[in-house]
Amino acid sequence: MATWGLLLRAGPRLLRERRARISHCLLRRTFFGFPRTKAGSAVTQQGDVCLRLCSPRSSTTATSAAGEDAWLKWGLLLVPLTAFCLGTWQIQRRKWKLDLIAQLASRLSSEPIPLTLDPMELKELEYRPVKVRGHFDHSKELYILPRSLVDPEREAREAGKLTSHAENGANVITPFYCTELGVTILVNRGFVPKKKLKPETRLKGQIEEEIDLTGVVRLSEKRKPFVPENNIEKNRWHYRDLEAMAKVTGAEPIFIDADFRSTVPGGPIGGQTRVSLRNEHMQYIVTWYGLCAATSFLWYRKFIQKIPL
């Protein structure tokens, strides 16, 4: 009974204090933002608004929305930052690739060394000039096709042109017995046009005597996408598979490209080595930095200038 009496005495006082706080809030909102009606009862009209504004639930919702906006803002900033880092990484990759191409070009122009039969050493000698002495076995020719003639002078003249007039044909691969080493290797003698593919059409170039030969070491190739499989039965090869070529000819899986000085009248044109390393890093640099610039601009408009996208 004492408790009920206390509540009855305190209840009216608590109710008056609650009404005073609500009235004060309503009057404040009316003065700063909500016009009074002609009847002057802005308190009545804005009561539901003020209650919502003053409620703890509204404050929690606003805080949650602000937190979500912050996460979105800084999360989206990762997009241009990541693109910038990838573009910078591609600059380093391009520098590394250009240095590698320069090293290979320098290796091609170095003095030839005697050919080694050590497989581990051969792996380190790709594009390195070597010299051998021996003779060809023209009865076991192989053909890598289609191929176009590697002609640096023609390529320099046609640089920038939309069309090219390179002649199509094949590279002739011939077993070569090395008299000093006592083994047979594979030699890419060079390019022949289609009309000279058959050996009987170039008998003058089918040299039989023992010769000194200089060429560059080449390793086995992996088949690239969209490149056909080698057709061993028809002697149509599309990439260097040294193990398969050695099995067909009985030679060792050692391959060299004969240099241009090995060319004989009526025979294949030597010097068909092309240093081909993919170097598309400039395209990637432009792509990543372009994406960085575009997304940075959109982020700035959205979160700094507050312009709807």
From Swiss-Prot:
The chain crosses the membrane at residues 71-89, 284-304. It comes from Gallus gallus (Chicken). The lineage of its organism: Eukaryota, Metazoa, Chordata, Craniata, Vertebrata. Belongs to the SURF1 family. GO terms for biological process: mitochondrial cytochrome c oxidase assembly. Keywords: Membrane, Mitochondrion, Mitochondrion inner membrane, Transmembrane, Transmembrane helix. GO terms for cellular component: mitochondrial inner membrane; mitochondrion. InterPro entries: Surf1/Shy1 (IPR002994), Surf1/Surf4 (IPR045214). Pfam families: SURF1. GO terms for molecular function: cytochrome-c oxidase activity. CDD domains: SURF1 (cd06662). This is Surfeit locus protein 1. It is found in: Mitochondrion inner membrane. May play a role in mitochondrial respiratory chain complex IV assembly. Probably involved in the biogenesis of the COX complex. Its main location: mitochondrion.
